[in-house]
Amino acid sequence: MQTFFIIAILALGFLITFQIAKASEYVAVLRGEEKTRKQSNKVNAFLLLVFLIVGLIGVYYCNEQLKGKILGEPASDHGVLIDRMLYITIALTGIVFFATQIALFWFSFKYQESDKRKAFFYPHNNKLELIWTVIPAIALTVLVGFGLFYWFKITGDAPKDAMQVEVVGKQFGWEFRYPGRDKILGKKYFKNIDPAKNNPAGQIWEDPANHDDIFMEQEMHLVVNKPVRLVIGAKDVIHDVGLAHFRLKMDAVPGTPTTMWFTPKYTTKQMAEKTGKPDFVYEISCDQMCGKGHYSMRGVIVVETQEEFDIWMAGKKPQYLVANPDKDPSIKKDTATVQPLAAIIK
């Protein structure tokens, strides 16, 4: 029934529009074609001016109403550079937008058809063509220059002392791996992936560098004011590491590692105070449609001080010991203390 009413309303609207158009034709015939055209031009010229004024007011109003919806201050040093590029682009294109739109609609109103003047047609003008070629070229050169300057800073090599974290996307979640004290991520092989044997990352246990690697899911911890280099990959389909608060994103491609680096500027607690949101968290999202569960690929990033990070890391057990409990010294120690008690009981 609802579909029927929608179709009926659309049909009625079409008929009304058609009848108005036909009535306008009859009026034009009665009043004379030339007089009708001039009157129509005058009305359209006035409406264009109204559209310009209402449009500019609308642009201002929308910006005022929606400015609280933006992400706010960037939380990384690279984010500052990216926002700066955005502001430069908006400034240049904004000047062009307002200048051209105001001129376009004002000229349409001012130079509407009139019996007092006749249109002059410009077949060619070298000076005019030079102006509208040189000015856009200069503007684009400025944009490209700033873009390349900041781009090389953002995509350059990470500092040698940068913290390293492996980020792997899967349907539908995130996995993180931290190198241990050796600061080297161990080797892995996709055929070794076996969550049932506590080896979800496919680590090669024969590689000593894997013996102290820490494995995590859905939550990544970073240190404030310390550069971090992300080594990014995927298990199944293409994902995309989206770090909106840090103004960064990078594709996660199966079999082809990608990297990016940045330096967090504020801890999670500091950003919560800045935003006035006590429950604020940094998020990692998948910015590439990856399947039916794409919406659920939300991870959490905790930015904290070095002391807090060290305490958190100290409480984590290397995945090698989780997968090979017989190699865990703490378990052996517990067993050794229990055996004499068993002997005494006997």
Each model region followed by its residue ranges:
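Non-transmembrane, membrane-proximal soluble domains of secreted or membrane proteins
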Residues: 33-39, 55-88, 101-346
